[in-house]
């Protein structure tokens, strides 16, 4: 499996990408060579500044996709980034979780106003009274931590973690970004379907969107493309 690379984009990176999008959108009659020039002029300095070992960029212009790649997916093996390289989605996965929750709402399986305990009755601690799926989806449950602790290894550990959590403020009053919040929302949103989270994501989001090379668990034949 290719080595993993963790990179947190800063304000400069976000500003640069915005500039790329604006420049491309302003080029009403941009030819492929112009698009190539715009992308390389924008991205190449960024790669050098941020010391990014490998990167892929896709631009859709007038309905046509353009793909650009730089560097290595695996530095040790000198394996280059290609159009088939698989990158971890990171926090973009939260967008997919939101879409999956929206699909469950559209099917009439859940409502955002539903209490969390409706889908996890074992969550009996009093602090969960009044916390809804909406609070979980919008990070407003009361200050859930950024991550689920590493020592949580089983479903009973997970229940204990949420049972012992103590909110810092009332639900719906403040927002705090937390993987343990949106993650729980996704897990509960699929419960009425009887599907696992992975099954629901595959059949209700990935397949309808024709995301045929997007997985939660990369299948062994595709691991050679993993960055």
Q: Where on the chain are the PLM-derived regions?
A:
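Sec-dependent signal peptide recognition
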Residues: 13-19
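N-terminal signal peptide c-region/cleavage motif recognized by signal peptidases
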Residues: 25-27
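Short active-site loop at a secondary-structure junction
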Residues: 48-56, 76-136, 167-181
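Short, surface-exposed loop or secondary-structure junction motifs
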Residues: 67-70, 74, 126-227
């Amino acid at each position: 499996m290719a080595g993993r690379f963790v990179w947190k984009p800063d304000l400069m990176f976000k500003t640069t990408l915005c500039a790329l999008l604006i420049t491309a959108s302003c080029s009403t009659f941009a030819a492929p060579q112009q698009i190539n020039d715009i992308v390389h002029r924008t991205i190449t300095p960024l790669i050098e500044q941020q010391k990014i070992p490998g990167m892929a960029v896709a631009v859709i212009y007038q309905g046509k996709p353009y793909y650009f790649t730089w560097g290595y997916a695996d530095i040790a093996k000198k394996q280059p980034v290609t159009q088939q390289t698989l990158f971890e989605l990171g926090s973009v996965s939260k967008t997919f979780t939101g879409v999956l929750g929206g699909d469950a709402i559209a099917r009439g399986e859940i409502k955002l106003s539903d209490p969390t305990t409706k889908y996890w009755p074992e969550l009996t601690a009093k602090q969960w009274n009044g916390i809804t799926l909406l609070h979980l989806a919008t990070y407003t449950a009361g200050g859930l931590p950024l991550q689920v602790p590493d020592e949580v290894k089983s479903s009973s550990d997970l229940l204990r973690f949420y049972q012992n959590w103590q909110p810092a403020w009332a639900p719906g009053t403040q927002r705090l970004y937390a993987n343990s919040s949106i993650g729980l929302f996704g897990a509960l949103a699929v419960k009425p379907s009887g599907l696992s989270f992975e099954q629901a994501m595959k059949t209700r989001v990935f397949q309808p969107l024709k995301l045929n090379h997007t997985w939660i668990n990369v299948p062994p034949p595709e691991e050679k493309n993993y960055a």
